[in-house]
Swiss-Prot record:
Family stated for the protein in its record: Belongs to the bacterial ribosomal protein bL33 family.
GO cellular component: cytosolic large ribosomal subunit
Keywords in alphabetical order: Ribonucleoprotein, Ribosomal protein
Superkingdom assignment: Bacteria
Designated name of the protein: Large ribosomal subunit protein bL33
Family matches, as NCBIfam families: PRK00595.1, rpmG_bact
Keyword Phosphoprotein among record annotations: no
Gene3D superfamilies: Ribosomal protein L33
InterPro entries noted in UniProt: Ribosomal_bL33, Ribosomal_bL33_CS, Ribosomal_bL33_sf, Ribosomal_zn-bd
UniProt keyword S-adenosyl-L-methionine, yes or no: no
Biological classification of the source: Bacteria, Bacillati, Actinomycetota, Actinomycetes, Micrococcales
Organism, as annotated: Micrococcus luteus (strain ATCC 4698 / DSM 20030 / JCM 1464 / CCM 169 / CCUG 5858 / IAM 1056 / NBRC 3333 / NCIMB 9278 / NCTC 2665 / VKM Ac-2230) (Micrococcus lysodeikticus)
A GO BP entry: translation
One Gene Ontology molecular-function label: structural constituent of ribosome
HAMAP family from the UniProt entry: Ribosomal_bL33
């Protein structure tokens, strides 16, 4: 039913602070073909840190 190469795949964003905390989101593969990095809140260290896309 679902396409193998979906335009908006579900990705995990993992904290670069080393806490293991993750966010789950979707990204548009046409607009962002590379791995994305977002600055989001990590509740373990109670700070905003970079979250990188995990494959």
């Amino acid at each position: 039913m679902a396409k193998d190469k979906d335009v908006r795949p579900i990705i995990k964003l993992k904290s670069t602070a080393g806490t293991g905390f993750t966010y789950v989101t979707r990204k548009n593969r046409r607009n962002n073909p590379d791995r994305i990095t977002l600055k989001k809140y990590d509740p373990v260290v109670r700070k905003h840190v970079d979250f990188r896309e995990e494959r």
